[in-house]
């Protein structure tokens, strides 16, 4: 629906003033796109106007303190911490009075004034409203009239800075592991360990995040694993920082008794409709994280937190491996261990590679030395000739003389 303002009172001669976008079904705009629409004006009788203009504005503001709504110190108190960044400032004239006359007369009836403008090609931060600041864009039509206050109508313009979750940094799997000793000093009851992995860093609204985790409870307490998505808002103003953090979604696991282990093989946590990550504004930032934590009675909770990016362009699945993360995740958490290489394959037999004919062609016969005579000398060189170009011994995994070897222990590598 378009914005509309009416004029009442003895001097009110404008019945309505409205602002309508050309594509009302378009939810949001991005940098470089065109915004089009028209201003609707209905006059009950002839109206004298100085002009009709259109304003498009966009800015990010962050402020807090005793005078957060003002830019000056009031009553000697502390000045407000405030900062502002301008993204859009545009003014268009839709109706002007003839030169030298100052006013124009608008006849009774309905009038329509089209407008069209392009958003800047530079990155525009996503629209957002938070506790200590906002990023807002608006379009306003202002009707200038002589001897009476200006009349205006305003429409919000939703802008989004697209984040593609198919970029390589956002397709990287995330994993962490941590252990906590329950108790203190000599009264420890054993450790609680937690390992967590997710398939990628980037997700979109409405997606469900499969969580892979293993919880091992070696303490004497009954523990409960939980997972949650947190939104963190960071505001910068006058060199100061404010942070707001709250939970947007959560899921709970089963109780884990002492000496027990629980595994999450893709436990789903759905992302609710939230503002996409805001990473390109210098005074307001919106980040997300996935926290998997364990509530331990009588002790601080054990928590692992993995960063998330909530994007706007969903995962395409292109180039996805056939095997899922679930197949790589087992009960013994094998993805945390360094896998040893497979046993090497035996090399081929030398005789299978080099034929006797080729051997004779490339190896000339040894001449008999002049200072050696007799059958013994010839036999010696014949032996050298026979074994000089022999292939190496065949590969064998079994020692043919095990009696001379000492027993060795197998070697394992643990991360």
From Swiss-Prot:
A motif (PPxY motif 2) lies at residues 392-395. Gene3D superfamilies: 2.60.40.640. It is found in: Early endosome; Cell membrane; Cytoplasmic vesicle. Signal peptide: none annotated. It comes from the Eukaryota. Induction: Up-regulated by high iron diet. Keywords: Cell membrane, Cytoplasmic vesicle, Endosome, Membrane, Repeat. GO terms for molecular function: ubiquitin-like ligase-substrate adaptor activity. A motif (PPxY motif 1) lies at residues 347-350. Its main location: other. GO terms for biological process: extracellular vesicle biogenesis; positive regulation of interferon-beta production; protein K63-linked ubiquitination; protein transport; protein ubiquitination. GO terms for cellular component: early endosome; endosome; extracellular vesicle; plasma membrane. It is a peripheral membrane protein. Pfam families: Arrestin_C, Arrestin_N. Belongs to the arrestin family. Functions as an adapter recruiting ubiquitin-protein ligases to their specific substrates. Plays a role in endocytosis of activated G protein-coupled receptors (GPCRs). Through an ubiquitination-dependent mechanism also plays a role in the incorporation of SLC11A2 into extracellular vesicles. May play a role in glucose uptake. Participates in innate immune response by promoting IFIH1/MDA5 activation through interaction with TRIM65. Interacts with ADRB2. Interacts (via PPxY motifs) with ITCH, NEDD4L and WWP2. Interacts with AVPR2. Identified in a complex containing at least ARRDC4, AVPR2 and HGS. Interacts with SLC11A2; controls the incorporation of SLC11A2 into extracellular vesicles through an ubiquitination-dependent mechanism. Interacts with TRIM65. This is Arrestin domain-containing protein 4. It comes from Mus musculus (Mouse). The lineage of its organism: Eukaryota, Metazoa, Chordata, Craniata, Vertebrata.
């Amino acid at each position: 629906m378009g914005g509309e303002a009416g004029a009442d009172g003895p001097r009110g001669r404008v019945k309505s003033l409205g602002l309508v976008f050309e594509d009302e079904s378009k939810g949001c705009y991005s940098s470089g796109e065109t915004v089009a629409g028209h201003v609707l004006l209905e006059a009950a009788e002839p109206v004298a106007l100085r002009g009709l203009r259109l304003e498009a504005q966009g800015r990010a503001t962050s402020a807090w303190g005793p005078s957060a709504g003002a830019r000056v110190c009031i009553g000697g108190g502390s000045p407000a911490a405030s900062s502002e960044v301008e993204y859009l400032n545009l003014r268009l004239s839709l109706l002007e009075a003839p030169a030298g006359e100052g006013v124009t007369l608008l006849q009774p009836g309905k009038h329509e004034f089209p407008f069209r403008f392009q958003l800047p090609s530079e990155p525009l931060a996503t629209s957002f409203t938070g506790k200590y600041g906002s990023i807002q864009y608006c379009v306003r039509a202002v009707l200038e009239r002589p001897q009476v206050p200006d009349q205006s109508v305003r429409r919000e313009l939703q802008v989004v800075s697209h984040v593609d979750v198919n970029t390589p940094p956002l397709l990287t799997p995330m994993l962490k592991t941590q252990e906590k000793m329950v108790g203190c000093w000599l009264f420890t009851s054993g450790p609680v360990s937690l390992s967590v992995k997710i398939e990628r860093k980037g997700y979109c609204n409405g997606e469900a995040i499969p969580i892979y985790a293993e919880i091992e409870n070696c303490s004497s307490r009954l523990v409960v694993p939980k997972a949650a998505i947190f939104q963190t808002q960071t505001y910068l103003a006058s060199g100061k920082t404010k942070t707001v953090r709250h939970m947007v979604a959560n899921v709970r696991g089963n109780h884990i008794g002492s000496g027990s282990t629980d595994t999450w093989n893709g436990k789903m946590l759905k992302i609710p409709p939230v503002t996409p990550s805001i990473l390109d504004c210098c005074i307001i930032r919106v980040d997300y994280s996935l926290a998997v934590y364990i509530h331990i009675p009588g002790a601080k909770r054990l928590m692992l937190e993995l960063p998330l990016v909530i994007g706007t362009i969903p995962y395409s699945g292109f180039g996805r491996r056939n095997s899922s993360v679930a197949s790589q995740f087992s009960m013994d958490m094998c993805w945390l261990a360094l896998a040893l290489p497979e046993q090497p394959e035996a090399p081929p037999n030398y005789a299978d590679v080099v034929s006797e004919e080729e051997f004779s062609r490339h190896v000339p016969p040894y001449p008999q030395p002049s200072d050696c005579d007799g059958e013994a000398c010839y036999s010696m060189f014949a032996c050298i000739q026979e074994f000089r170009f022999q292939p190496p011994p065949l590969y064998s995994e079994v020692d043919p003389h095990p009696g001379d070897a000492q027993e060795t222990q197998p070697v394992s590598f643990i991360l």
